[in-house]
Regions:
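Conserved, carboxylate-rich catalytic/transport cores that coordinate ions
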Residues: 1-284
């Protein structure tokens, strides 16, 4: 079991475990069990409900829960036991979740991983200055990379949209004044965790649906014909092949095909932004 977050993260609220299972894998996503410490109707619960979320600004965090909880007892610190809720997924070689289970659990993280460090290990292998640190993961790291690739391929076959948009980070000086704005780079490590969290979300949603329990779902409706027509004109003017966009209903696979061509031609970012604005807003 290990965590993987940004270098500045203080509240480590999720961890993963992974092992080989025949031709497939067993993926565990472990989320800090805040409900063990924050009881329904308590003062902490009411204050958390009032705040709604933790607010992340440039150089600080206004937490939803007191720091001794979010950064302390509920942070999945390496080397100590922590209470979690775990989604255990059995995933086959085609990226299909064939079985999943949800459990209250106790985990003991072996490593506090950092995105940038792991990206360096993935890129440079044994030559990375972080190779020794991540060697404790053994075959788990190999399995994680293999499963990430499998899930990504499965997502592509389903026609899932992978829209990369640039995220900016403001660099402050010692007085708290902005001195630079840089683009945040997303590497394999970030995308790998994203895929694993999506798999866990789908497993939880499927479990609740099967049990007939009420649940809030995030829904993206089909884009309007007018917005798709405008996007088609935009893409055509850039010289992109819009053949996949013709028809009565534009599918995610069709949009993915246009995005893929845009990426190959080095204009993926701008096309992703325009496409994002053409899609319907999510509703719950």
């Amino acid at each position: 079991v290990f965590t993987l977050d940004g270098a500045d993260a203080k509240d480590l609220d999720d961890a993963i475990s992974i092992s080989r299972d025949g031709d497939g894998y067993i993926l565990g996503v472990h989320i800090a069990d805040v409900s063990h410490y924050v009881r329904p109707g308590s003062e902490l619960d009411r204050e958390a409900m009032r705040r709604g979320t933790s607010v992340y600004v440039t150089d600080r965090v206004v937490p939803m829960l007191p720091r001794p909880i979010s950064n302390g007892i509920c942070s999945l610190t390496a080397g100590v036991d922590r209470l979690t809720v775990s989604a255990i997924m059995h995933i086959d070689a085609q990226g299909r979740t064939v079985r999943s289970e949800l459990h209250r659990s106790v985990i003991h993280s072996r490593l506090r991983g950092v995105y940038g460090e792991l990206n360096d290990v993935i890129a440079r292998g044994a030559e990375s200055e972080y190779a020794e640190k991540y060697s404790v993961l053994g075959e788990s790291l190999t399995c994680a990379q293999e499963l990430y690739s499998i899930l990504l391929d499965a997502s592509g076959r389903r026609g899932a949209l992978d829209m990369e948009t640039d995220e900016a980070r403001i660099i402050l000086d010692e007085n708290g004044a902005p001195r630079d704005i840089v683009l945040v780079e997303r590497g394999t490590a970030e995308r790998m965790i994203e895929q694993f969290m999506l798999a866990a979300n789908e497993a939880v949603a499927q479990t609740l649906r099967t049990a007939g329990m009420p649940c809030v779902y995030r829904i993206h409706e089909d884009p309007s014909p007018e917005k798709m027509q405008a996007f088609s004109v935009f893409a055509h003017n850039l010289g992109l092949d819009i053949t996949p966009l013709r028809g009565d209903r534009v599918t995610p696979a069709a949009l993915s095909a246009v995005l893929a061509e845009a990426e190959r031609r080095g204009i993926g970012s701008v096309v992703s932004v325009v496409l994002l604005r053409s899609l319907m807003k999510a509703r719950y």
